[in-house]
Amino acid sequence: MKLTCMVIITVLFLTASQLITADYSRDQRQYRAVRLGDEMRNFKGARDCGGQGEGCYTQPCCPGLRCRGGGTGGGSCQP
């Protein structure tokens, strides 16, 4: 009898937790590893070029941007 009650309670708990997480992750990507891979790929330090407004003294500007400004502190990447 006690074992049956424990099994029923466990099944109800697992069902409730599945419903809660399914509702929470509806608008998110399915696989966490894919999401983390995209975040790592888009990480600011992972790029080999400077984005708009970033300094271009130590790295080249990304395609479509030019190094403008100069001076003692170096320029910045601008369109």
Swiss-Prot record:
Q: What would be an example GO MF term here?
A: ion channel inhibitor activity
Q: Which residues carry this modification: 4-hydroxyproline?
A: 60, 63
Pfam families reported for this sequence: Conotoxin (PF02950)
- Between which residues do disulfide bridges form? 49-62, 56-67, 61-77
Its signal peptide is: 1-22
Protein localization: Secreted
The record's GO CC annotations read: extracellular region
Q: Which residues form the propeptide?
A: 23-47
Does Chaperone appear among the keywords? no
Question: Its function?
Answer: Ion channel inhibitor that inhibits the increase in intracellular calcium upon depolarization in DRG neurons. In vivo, both intraperitoneal and intracranial injections into mice induce hyperactivity.
Domain remark from Swiss-Prot or TrEMBL: The presence of a 'disulfide through disulfide knot' structurally defines this protein as a knottin. The cysteine framework is VI/VII (C-C-CC-C-C).
The protein here is known as: Conotoxin Vi6.9
Origin species, per record, is Conus virgo
